[in-house]
């Protein structure tokens, strides 16, 4: 198995280099951000494959160790998508197949590239949204603290660019804190939407394998 065999868009003719560069030029760079999530999704997928009998316990153990080894390489910055390899999904499968033989090819059983990509993106979004929620909560707590700290410090309240009534710096900080409450609800809602597993949709019309 060589890298060029993992290129899905290879249809037996040489593509126009300018068109290829325009359409997929940044794909590998962007895919690198999904690498650890691809491994994470594959670890869950092979556990399911063993559960329904498509993998033996020995194969599951072997593949799990292989995927965790790749995850360590990603974390250490030693993982790269080879020039002739389509994307991160193909690269992970290629590395497993080189190291483990035919067992490496089995990780694609019961899933399509379509739902595999969606899994990676949802895991990525879920992680990013969690970090965003943590950052917003930190800012909210800080503003709430400043609101309490400066609640007795007066400042003018304006309306239509004119001084309207007495206010305080505490109320000013608190107002900004309150605006973040809705933001945190929106982030939480987005996280719940991202936290849905698309595996099983395969290429778009379900999998013929009765996956769990």
What are these regions (language model features)?
Residues 4, 9-206, 212:
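A helix-coil-helix interface module used to build multimeric assemblies
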